[in-house]
Amino acid sequence: MSTAALVEGKIVQCIGAVIDVEFPRDSMPKIYDALILDGSELTLEVQQQLGDGVVRTICLGASDGLRRGLTVKNTAKPISVPVGKPTLGRIMDVLGRPIDEAGPIDSDVTRSIHQKAPAFDELSPSTELLETGIKVIDLICPFAKGGKVGLFGGAGVGKTVNMMELINNIAKEHGGYSVFAGVGERTREGNDFYHEMKDSNVLDKVALVYGQMNEPPGNRLRVALTGLTMAEHFRDEGLDVLFFVDNIYRFTLAGTEVSALLGRMPSAVGYQPTLAEEMGKLQERITSTKKGSITSVQAVYVPADDLTDPSPATTFGHLDATVVLSRDIASLGIYPAVDPLDSTSRQIDPNVIGEEHYSITRRVQQTLQRYKELRDIIAILGMDELSPEDKLSVARARKIQRFLSQPFHVAEVFTGSPGKYVPLKETIRGFKMIVDGECDHLPEQAFYMVGTIDEAFEKAKKIQ
């Protein structure tokens, strides 16, 4: 450690998670330098230089017991976390310290959590599809390998369950390494996830970084960067890595909490004025280069189910595929509650997914859109007033709607029905049969919570 690392300062003000520290004028810390409280492990991160030797910092940990006059040392470098294989199978906090009581992490390599995004000429876009085994996603909003996916939804519509199923289906089949960043989510979910990974013997391929709801805003603001730094290291070593974030909204919210304490004027709906920049800095780093790829799945909480809220609206622009979860569909008992008319993907292009897949997707969406338009008429006048073509459209749309539901492996404990993984070919074949009218004679309840179309035929026999 250099001599500058030993420069000491004194705390001059504490307001919640924001601490002001005074240093000698000729050796002020730089922005993002990590400061350590003398005699403890508490870390502060420099956010602003106020002049006269005073810097404003965010406390990455509880600020209980801090007072004016305490000594703080400057490490003269940003927060660095351990990276590489020793992090696999471990649970770490925002500073890369283990919190799973399984001993220290013996990694020789550390890396700063603040990195520049890769240069444009290093990027490597991919059109290779990533099969998830979830019918509605593979059909309507297919994922690309090395792409970015957002799961948007309000409270309680199934973002975390969908993400767990994706981890279950992709991470277990994938064989490569995964990084999971729990940003401001429930501790219970983090615990469940750890045991789920352990029971399915894939824990040795996953690095877990948690900054849960009960932690100070500084931790929640930086934990996504810690997880991303670990994923970037695997990518730069030439590996294909999966990066899961639950939940990006809490990252924004932590920024909002900190922003007000730093004395910035709030912007729309009380968010920080630097919302777009903070989101951009994070998202631009989650990308695939010529060395390796990062495929990321991010859960995005939508406050009050309003997709125009600045936080989800800012996230939309950075993603390759958006999976929108709808409360209306969840209220019908159809899970996963993905809205097939609102969800989109850049991969929906006949040159990428093939002519057959493209045409089936569009026909399914047209049928569902027609049903949506006719719903008001049906509510007022009933089905009898519709033309024969419209009656057929409605019947097929209701079958499609039910066929888009699917039992999940991770929900077996709650539902009692075994989870289903449906290959893409089977998904396309099933929906093709419905829109071509080959299933018109089957009752619509036969399509609810089944895997392939063959299961729907079997279920219909039992019903009849």
Curated annotation (Swiss-Prot):
What compartments host this protein?
Cell inner membrane
The GO terms describing molecular function are: ATP binding; ATP hydrolysis activity; proton-transporting ATP synthase activity, rotational mechanism
Where is the signal peptide, in residue numbers?
Answer: none
Look up and give the membrane topology term.
Answer: Peripheral membrane protein
| Catalyses which reaction(s) | ATP + H2O + 4 H(+)(in) = ADP + phosphate + 5 H(+)(out)
What SUPFAM superfamilies does its record include?
C-terminal domain of alpha and beta subunits of F1 ATP synthase, N-terminal domain of alpha and beta subunits of F1 ATP synthase, P-loop containing nucleoside triphosphate hydrolases
Gene Ontology cellular-component terms for this entry are: plasma membrane; proton-transporting ATP synthase complex
Pfam families attached to this UniProt entry: ATP-synt_ab, ATP-synt_ab_N, ATP-synt_VA_C
User: Which family, according to the similarity comment?
Assistant: Belongs to the ATPase alpha/beta chains family.
Do you know which PANTHER family this protein is assigned to? Answer: ATP SYNTHASE, ATP SYNTHASE SUBUNIT BETA, MITOCHONDRIAL
Quaternary arrangement and interactors, per the entry?
F-type ATPases have 2 components, CF(1) - the catalytic core - and CF(0) - the membrane proton channel. CF(1) has five subunits: alpha(3), beta(3), gamma(1), delta(1), epsilon(1). CF(0) has three main subunits: a(1), b(2) and c(9-12). The alpha and beta chains form an alternating ring which encloses part of the gamma chain. CF(1) is attached to CF(0) by a central stalk formed by the gamma and epsilon chains, while a peripheral stalk is formed by the delta and b chains.
Task: Specify the protein name.
Answer: ATP synthase subunit beta
- The species this protein belongs to is Burkholderia cenocepacia (strain ATCC BAA-245 / DSM 16553 / LMG 16656 / NCTC 13227 / J2315 / CF5610) (Burkholderia cepacia (strain J2315))
